[in-house]
A protein has these predicted regions:
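Short, flexible loop/turn elements at secondary-structure junctions
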Residues: 11, 107, 184-186
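Cysteine-centered iron-sulfur cluster-binding motifs in ferredoxin-type domains/subunits
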Residues: 3-14, 41
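Cofactor-/ligand-binding subdomain signature composed of acidic, glycine-rich
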Residues: 19-99, 145, 157-159, 247, ...
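Conserved hydrophobic/aromatic pocket- or pore-lining residues that grip, position, or stack substrates
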Residues: 42, 103, 120
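Non-catalytic alpha/beta scaffold blocks inside enzyme catalytic domains
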Residues: 66-69, 80, 95-96, 113-114, ...
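Short glycine-rich phosphate-binding loop at a beta-alpha junction
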Residues: 100-106
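Glycine- and other small-residue-rich loops at beta-strand/loop junctions that grip anionic moieties
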Residues: 7, 106, 281
Length: 324
């Protein structure tokens, strides 16, 4: 099957098709958009940006949490169900004041995920401590590939979420921020990574793949990747572009016309190999955060990603009148 989407390898957002078989991404090929990438796609995006989606060795396969009497350095993360993981996050939030909790948004996440995280931080937790880790400059080929390797920094600017600065880091190191919620990003992109990780009392990671410091988390929530969700990114031209799901997860959001199914997938029998691909137990961040808000007594009222975007378009003047 192949599904129209965009590349998330840099700030350009080349239009592409995601080709999938056995629920595994097999290739990415360029899709014509004369305003963004014409007919082309760089080798970095075409060959590298999907590998983590298929990487069963590092994918987070289940919610996990640490037993309350086990230290960071002792390991102790164990599989649990979604309800228990969310209940643990809520329990930890209730232990702290709003200004003791920080949220790290992500320039790798959709506009919808970041918007709902921002609402949760400010409206539910009562925290203005939300920022994102800025991009690290990389190669710029002056044709397609941009130096900014994050696909949604402009989306964060639209939402008014600022890059992490020295003052924010100092508050972590000085333990003024006692609990940190990190969405779809890695502390490894910050300087003094180990020192920062050790300074956090409670760390909640909403991530798709494990990384070096993730074993220090209190709770790990499996995040769906860009190939498994609906959503939008804002590229370096300030062009709003959609991603669509091509890979199935255990809980799949389906909007009309958004999920391609090949002839083989559609007509495969239960004993056919192509019907047996791994479906990860991952959810989009906006959905999990909305559930947390509901547990805390506030209903955001979103049933799908499109409704989140409609709310964003109603509140952000630059997006007024836009829809899926």
């Amino acid at each position: 099957s192949h599904t129209d989407s965009i590349c998330t390898g840099c700030a350009r957002g080349c239009n592409m098709e995601t080709w999938v078989r056995d629920n595994i991404v097999k290739r990415l090929i360029p899709r014509e958009n004369m305003d963004v990438n014409q007919y082309w796609m760089c080798d970095y995006g075409r060959l590298n940006t999907y590998k983590f989606i298929n990487d069963e060795a590092t994918r987070v396969k289940s919610p996990m949490m640490r037993e309350e009497d086990v230290s960071q350095d002792a390991g102790g993360l164990k599989d649990c169900d979604w309800d228990d993981a969310i209940a643990r996050v809520i329990s930890e939030i209730k232990n702290y004041k709003g200004d003791e909790i920080a949220f790290i948004a992500s320039a790798y996440s959709t506009l919808e995920d970041n918007f709902v995280l921002q609402r949760f931080a400010k409206e539910i937790v009562g925290s203005d401590n939300i920022a994102y880790i800025p991009h690290i400059e990389g190669e710029d080929d002056k044709l397609l590939l941009r130096a900014d390797k994050t696909p949604n920094a402009n989306g964060l600017k639209l939402l008014g979420i600022e890059p992490i600065n020295g003052k924010f880091i100092d508050k972590i190191l000085n333990k003024q921020f006692k609990m940190v919620y990190i969405m779809n990003d890695s502390l490894g992109r910050l300087e003094r990574t180990e020192e920062i990780a050790k300074s956090i009392e409670i760390a909640v990671l909403h991530i798709s793949n494990f990384y070096e410091q993730s074993h220090k988390a209190t709770v790990v929530l499996p995040s769906a990747t860009y190939a498994e969700i609906n959503g939008t990114f804002v590229n370096f031209q300030s062009r709003v572009q959609r991603i669509k799901p091509a890979v199935a997860t255990l809980e799949q959001e389906r909007l009309p016309g958004d999920f391609a199914v090949s002839r083989l997938d559609k007509f495969g029998a239960h004993n056919d190999r192509w019907t047996k691909g791994t479906r990860f137990n991952a959810r989009p961040a906006w959905k999990v955060i909305s559930q947390m808000a509901k547990v805390l007594g506030s209903e955001f009222g979103y049933d799908n990603t499109e409704e989140v975007f409609d709310d964003i378009a109603a509140k952000i003047p630059a997006l007024a009148g836009m829809s899926y």
